[in-house]
Amino acid sequence: AAVTCIFMTLFGLSLGFALLKVQGE
């Protein structure tokens, strides 16, 4: 459960950062 939570958090941050980078350009 803990590993899944961490994985989901990292995935969410990566996705959010990617979206911000795309909108920034």
Swiss-Prot record:
It comes from the Eukaryota. The chain crosses the membrane at residues 2-22. Belongs to the PetM family. One of its GO terms (biological process) is photosynthesis. GO terms for cellular component: chloroplast thylakoid membrane; cytochrome b6f complex. This is Cytochrome b6-f complex subunit 7. It is a single-pass membrane protein. Component of the cytochrome b6-f complex, which mediates electron transfer between photosystem II (PSII) and photosystem I (PSI), cyclic electron flow around PSI, and state transitions. Its main location: plastid. InterPro entries: PetM_cyt_b6/f_cplx_su7. It is found in: Plastid, Chloroplast thylakoid membrane. Keywords: Chloroplast, Electron transport, Membrane, Photosynthesis, Plastid, Thylakoid, Transmembrane, Transmembrane helix, Transport. The 4 large subunits of the cytochrome b6-f complex are cytochrome b6, subunit IV (17 kDa polypeptide, PetD), cytochrome f and the Rieske protein, while the 4 small subunits are PetG, PetL, PetM and PetN. The complex functions as a dimer.
